[in-house]
């Protein structure tokens, strides 16, 4: 399968047959739906893996952080208007670049969430549930956790007889039984 190649000033992303091309530079979509980003180190054939992301915009922001670090003002960015606000890596190591990428995508996620809340704060019908995917190892760690065990609860400072608004349990039980069980 012949891949798409950048020609001249085209803004189309490259596709080497490994994923769906994107409108953003340095971004492609995997078959299973994740958006990924990577960049080539200048002067070498080495690539730096920037990560896997939920949206193409997050992946494009990741690319912009790395491209701006390596190429400065000469970089062809996906979001040139954000160049001055992008986090800067401490050095050119792949770990430093990924840390800056992580910070940038967190900021982008927060901005997207805040703007979505401002657009329609009166209705929750536009809010989609967030699915959290855990690895089998993370699930096992949660299952083996002692956070909710009786011994942990015995040693906690939580007083089950008192609620946050200072209503005592006996008063609550009386109040609850007055309207729940009466016909």
UniProtKB/Swiss-Prot annotation:
Residues 1-12 have a biased composition (Polar residues). Keywords: Activator, DNA-binding, Ethylene signaling pathway, Nucleus, Transcription, Transcription regulation. Gene3D superfamilies: AP2/ERF domain (3.30.730.10). InterPro entries: AP2/ERF_dom, AP2/ERF_dom_sf, AP2/ERF_TF_ERF_subfamily, DNA-bd_dom_sf. It comes from the Eukaryota. Residues 1-25 are annotated as: Disordered. GO terms for molecular function: DNA binding; DNA-binding transcription factor activity. The keyword Plastid does not apply. It holds the Pfam family AP2. Transmembrane segments: none annotated. Residues 23-80 bind DNA. It is found in: Nucleus. GO terms for biological process: ethylene-activated signaling pathway; negative regulation of floral organ abscission. GO terms for cellular component: nucleus. Probably acts as a transcriptional activator. Binds to the GCC-box pathogenesis-related promoter element. May be involved in the regulation of gene expression by stress factors and by components of stress signal transduction pathways. Belongs to the AP2/ERF transcription factor family. ERF subfamily. This is Ethylene-responsive transcription factor ERF021. The lineage of its organism: Eukaryota, Viridiplantae, Streptophyta, Embryophyta, Tracheophyta.
């Amino acid at each position: 399968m012949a891949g798409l190649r950048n020609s001249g000033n085209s803004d189309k992303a490259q596709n080497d047959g490994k994923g769906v091309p994107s409108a953003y530079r340095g971004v492609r979509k995997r078959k299973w739906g994740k958006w990924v980003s990577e960049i080539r180190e200048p002067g070498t054939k080495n690539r730096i893996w920037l990560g896997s992301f939920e949206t193409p915009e997050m992946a494009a922001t990741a690319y912009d952080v790395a491209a701006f670090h390596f190429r400065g003002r000469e970089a062809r960015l996906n979001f040139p208007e954000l160049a001055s606000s992008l986090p800067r890596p401490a050095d050119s190591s792949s770990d430093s670049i990924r840390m800056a990428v992580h910070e940038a995508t967190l900021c982008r996620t927060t901005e997207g969430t805040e703007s979505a809340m401002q657009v329609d704060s009166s209705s929750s019908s536009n809010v989609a549930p967030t699915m959290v995917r855990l690895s089998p190892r993370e699930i096992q760690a949660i299952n083996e956790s002692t956070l909710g065990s009786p011994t942990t609860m015995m040693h906690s400072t939580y007083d089950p007889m008192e609620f946050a608004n200072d209503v005592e349990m006996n008063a609550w039980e009386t109040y609850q039984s007055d309207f729940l069980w009466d016909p």
